[in-house]
Amino acid sequence: NGQELRTGDIVLRCGSGLTSRAVLAADNGGSYSHVGIVVDSSGVMMIVHAVPGEHDFPNDFDRVKMDEAKTFFLTTRTKNGRILRYSDSIVAQKAAQAAYRLYKSGIIFDHEYDISDTTTLYCSELVEYAYKQAGILSITDGIRHDVNLPVFNYEQVILPSDFLHSSQLTTVSEF
């Protein structure tokens, strides 16, 4: 619901695709497989997120993109969702502005899931980095995971559920 969204809100969704299942497995059965951040684009609340496989046009590539909330939470992509909020709206707005700049700069999706390289970003890394640009050392309280699955083997990964467990965020809506 667009009226519930505020600039800087962190939105989580759980999808049913192959990538979603891999993320959930990496997260030991976590509830969410994807995360984005709400930005104000000319008065319209939009979601900036880094996502593989959701292309908008022929020859599109995996990248940081911006979607309407109804597109981000499409029932074909989403089983359930949640909206989290940071208490300081000024900081949240700065994080959203940073995310919007990253979207405008055409950052591509980080298939290496490398937290130390911000030239490419995956979904959780994008939101963490946006809040870091707003002065928050780690919106996920520094939680990192080493993931060792047959198709998903990475170190120091931030998972979508880490936002859910953050002491700095409050749930404002769940569906």
Segments from the language model and where they lie:
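A contiguous binding-surface segment within folded domains or other stable secondary-structure elements
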Residues: 82, 89, 93
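Loop/turn positions that initiate beta-strands
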Residues: 7-11
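Sec/Tat-exported extracytoplasmic proteins
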Residues: 15, 39, 51, 73, ...
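Short, surface-exposed secondary-structure edge patches
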Residues: 1-4, 27-29
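Extracytoplasmic/secreted proteins, especially bacterial periplasmic and envelope-associated proteins
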Residues: 6, 31, 94-98, 122-129
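Activation targets extended, charge/polar-rich intrinsically disordered C-terminal tails
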Residues: 111-175
